[in-house]
């Protein structure tokens, strides 16, 4: 049976935090509370005018006994991974695809633009800083993850993201998905630095036309009744997708972060848990 591995672009899904505290957080909290309770007990013994059998001291001793038992129990499971519901849902999707060929088809204008404009975006980066780049075609994999970064430079992995509009470019940041994707690519390639680059490329006319038609379809009755000006809406949509008049430096946004071995260890432990869950699924 083939071992389940995950693509780097999906790592953010399985690393989605669970609601509430993790086992390690619960363990650390219990250890901290035990230490502070021990301190209070010692202070109580020293400050009491009577002996250590006072009511306050007895209560604290009982609390310490309970906490020691709790710490002992939590220590056994502190490294166990609790998968989030998002992670479980994604693992179930993989199971359905692998076992029955089922796969949701989600194709958006944003996705199409990202694919179509990838080469143009890389060329824009070269024009901006004169550093030679070319689209990476090498596929990397290990026992846990696999993927193919956009660009591999001498010391840096660079992933290029095409922003849909000026608004999405303005709000662009290091999302959890892109963080884990970057960590995965660095681990696969041995690079220690990751550059997440957002680029504003003009949306291809055919995609803009489809976007206009889609928006018009949503407003069909309102447009027919004269509530909206069809030409003005189309003009605004075209404007929202045209950026070539802007200076190049205004069309590029870069975020950088470094390889984190501790996070990679967490990732692989989570994948171990994901495999166990995967093998427990049935129709």
What are these regions (language model features)?
Residues 1-116, 120, 124, 205, ...:
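Charged, glycine-rich intrinsically disordered N-terminal tails and low-complexity linkers that flank
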Residues 273-283:
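C-terminal helix/juxtamembrane-tail motif
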Residues 128-275:
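Nucleic-acid nuclease catalytic cores
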